[in-house]
Each structure stands twice: as structure tokens, then as C-alpha cells.
Amino acid sequence: MAEETGALPSRTDFSAWYNEVIRRADIMDVRYPVKGLYVWYPFGFALRNHTYTLLRSLLNRDHEETLFPLLIPETEFMKEAEHIKGFEDEVYWVTHGGLSPLDVKLALRPTSETAIYPMYALWVRSHADLPLKLYQVVNTFRYETKHTRPLIRLREITSFMESHTVHTDWDDANKQVEYELGLATEFYRDLGVPIIISRRPDWDKFPGADFTMAIDAVMPDGRTLQIGTVHHLGDHFSTTYNITYEDVNGEQKLASQTCFGISERCIAAIIAVHGDDKGLVLPATVAPTQVVIIPIIVGKRGDEIMAAVEKLESELKAAGLRVKTDARDMRPGAKYYHWELHGVPLRVELGPRDLDNNQLVCANRLGVKTTIPRENAADSVKRLLDEAHDQILEKAEDHLSSHLKTVKTVDECNQSLEENIVIVHWCGEKACADKLEELTNSSLLGTGVRSKYVVDDEGPCIVCGKPGKTALVGRSY
């Protein structure tokens, strides 16, 4: 965590920039001696905690938090054949307790359906028990064989929020799907991250789901990052695990279910979507430090300035802001570099001239400078933080809209995919999707697109020319 100076790689080389900013901005240390497992630095973990506090505050309106075990007996894990087929080559198995072989192998959860649903079968008895809406934030393990990358592709996902709900029927579960998509939209708006929602094609849906709705963000290089999913499970798992209830007529009915997940990819999205060549650009909603105060010590007025700084810090903290004063014995420029690298939303400078004029000089992370009166500083600072959030959201929206391209031919699709998500029409046939993916080295992301920048309409399929509907094509992390 030693301070480094010098410029970061340009963000136009996104991979190099991302790896370097993760390290130099104290997010994660990648040197742990197991591939795909990383260590949170305290600063990165604080960012993670503020982000998940925000997520929990939204979930707690409609869910209750719980915690299920990490280990899943093979007997329960193997009950759901279709589900397991989607994970079987990624599972870590515990085969011994000490030196003794276990009678039943234990899986480290890749996801928790097979841990949670046997318990739901015990808990749900009557329609009065429904809906049941629980979530947990846990670590999960998947034996990734692809190239691993901090926060994006991991073998240990350290912060997986998974919601699991149970409902009386398919329609009520579908309302929950819509609710959770709305929750995710609000969450990412609070992070300043614009998203695109679409329905994944059937061959790419969650194993065992009726359908999957996916939430994608656009990275600086035009690739997509899946940063959330909501799955309508129908009665698939309730059939396997016998999750039934007695309805108002005294009849036994199978329940319908949903699940919803967001991992620490939400942190990757914050870093990637907002960052610049100076480092992180953090939204004030989750920044570990929202305001840094820089004393400008000139001449013999140091004690007077520091007294004013301490008073200002106390006032801002009393207003509920996360504030630090950087009183280190170093040039102001070096301090600016440090706090810009770490993405602090607002810098407040206080020197002799500001003291004499009863003012504060403020600069937000995008470089917008403002002078505010010292009186009622907390109100002014909060307003500037709100304005800074609006500015980074607008910048991110501009990036998203500029990286969406509508095309009519496969050749146009191929050319546009270098830096964009491509909007096409597709007939719905897997053969056409397979051909398009093969010719363009891309993935058909989904249909039923929800974005203010995408018109969900009809047109001739880009491959066969038959009637089709709007679909997204992209290259993904």
C-alpha cells in the first residue's frame, strides 16, 4: 500500500489501466498465492461496505436478511440435474474431514439454491407463509478456468448478494421479478452507473429457470459486463425440493420462486464506468471519503488555519458526511494526486485568503471548481456532492449512448463490435444466433431490451431476413 507516483496507463488501454488502478488506488492486492483469489485492501473494503450498505437498505424494504451454510451435501446438490449441469465443472469439493474421507462429499457453494431450498421446504406450510423473501451476502466459489480478473472473474466471489423468494403462483413471482429489476435500477442509479436490461436467450438462461433477465453495463472499451441477474424459477425447484403450501381451499400446491443476484462486479462497474486517467471517480453515495480538506499553510498563520480546518471538519461530520483532513507535511499538489487517484468526490481547500474572505474553495473529482461561503458550509458541500453525482451520471450516460450502434448487416455488425454494443433484429431461431455469433465472434445478449437508448421494435432478421425483434449483440467480460 506504499504510495506510488507517476501517471497511470491511459484508460484507452482499459485492461492495463484497470489492473493498475485496482492496485494503486488500494482496492485489491492480487498477489495472494491462489489463482483467482484476491485480498481487499482496507480502502477497497470500505468502498465495498458502503456499496453493500446501500444495497441492503434497498433490499430491506421487501426482504429479510439471513445466512445459510457454505457447505452443501452432495445428496442435496445433485438432486437438481439441469441446475447442476450448469455448474458441475466449476464446483470445489470437500472430500475429507481431517484425514478421514467423508461419507458424503460437501460442495463449496457456487450458488445457494441447493442449500436454501431444502430448508424452504421445511419452513413453508401454508399460503399464510407466503410470500417468503430472504437474501444473504456471502462468499461463493467457482473453479473458473478462464482468465481471472479482480472483481470481474473470480474463483472466490467474496460479496455475492443472492435473494431467494417463494410465491403462491407464477404471476406473483413474475411481479417479484419486476420489483427486483426496479430495485437493481435504483441501486445502479445511486451508483451513477447506467444499465441495460434484457432477457437472455433460452440457451443462456440460469440453469433451471423459466427465464433470466440480465443487467449489463458498458465498459470503456465497449464490452459489456453483466452486473446482475433476476431469474424466474417457476415451479422447477419447488418440484425437486417439494416446496408446497396449503391454499385457502385446503389443497396442496407447488410454490413458484425467483432468485436475484448481484456480486462485487458492482464495484468493478463503479471503477470502470467512472474512472479516468487520474484514477478512480467515486460517487459520493459510496465513497469511503466524501470530502477531503486540504489546509493551505502559508507564512505564520498555520495554527489559525488548522483551527479553522478542525472546526470545518467537525461541522461537516456532524452533518453526516465522511470527511478527512490531509495535514501531511507535503506539497498540496502531491495531496491532490493522492486523493484524485482514490476518487474522492470533493476537495475543499482552506488557506489564508479563504480565511480572510470567509470562503472555501472546492473542486469536485471532475475538476469543476467552485467558491462557497464559509457560512452554512455543510449545506453547500452537500449540494456540490449532489451536483457531482449528476455530472458523473451524465458522463456515464453519454458513454453508454455513444457505444450503442444499430446495424442492418452482418458486416456492419462485425465492424461496429470493436467498440460497441450492436442493436440488430433477430428472428428468435438459435441457428441464426449461432451463425451470427460465429461470424462476429460475439454473443447474442438478449431481447426485450429495456433502455431509453434502444427502441424495442420489429424488423427483418439480420441473418435470414425473416420477421424479427430487437436484440443486442456484444462482446463481454
UniProtKB/Swiss-Prot annotation:
Keyword Cytoplasm: yes
One Pfam entry name: tRNA-synt_2b
Gene Ontology MF: a single term: proline-tRNA ligase activity
Top-level taxon in the UniProt lineage: Archaea
Record keywords: Aminoacyl-tRNA synthetase, ATP-binding, Cytoplasm, Ligase, Nucleotide-binding, Protein biosynthesis
SUPFAM superfamilies named in the record: C-terminal domain of ProRS, Class II aaRS ABD-related, Class II aaRS and biotin synthetases
BP term (GO), one: prolyl-tRNA aminoacylation
Cellular component GO terms held in the UniProt record: aminoacyl-tRNA synthetase multienzyme complex; cytoplasm
Record InterPro entries: aa-tRNA-synt_IIb, aa-tRNA-synth_II, aa-tRNA-synth_II/BPL/LPL, Anticodon-bd, Anticodon-bd_dom_sf, Pro-tRNA-ligase_IIa, Pro-tRNA-ligase_IIa_arc-type, Pro-tRNA_ligase_II_C
Catalytically driven reaction(s): tRNA(Pro) + L-proline + ATP = L-prolyl-tRNA(Pro) + AMP + diphosphate
Localization, UniProt: Cytoplasm
Keyword Ligase: yes
NCBIfam families per record: proS_fam_I
Known role: Catalyzes the attachment of proline to tRNA(Pro) in a two-step reaction: proline is first activated by ATP to form Pro-AMP and then transferred to the acceptor end of tRNA(Pro).
Record comment regarding domains: Consists of three domains: the N-terminal catalytic domain, the anticodon-binding domain and the C-terminal extension.
Assembly description: Homodimer.
Protein name per the record: Proline--tRNA ligase
Species this chain originates from: Methanocorpusculum labreanum (strain ATCC 43576 / DSM 4855 / Z)
Gene: proS
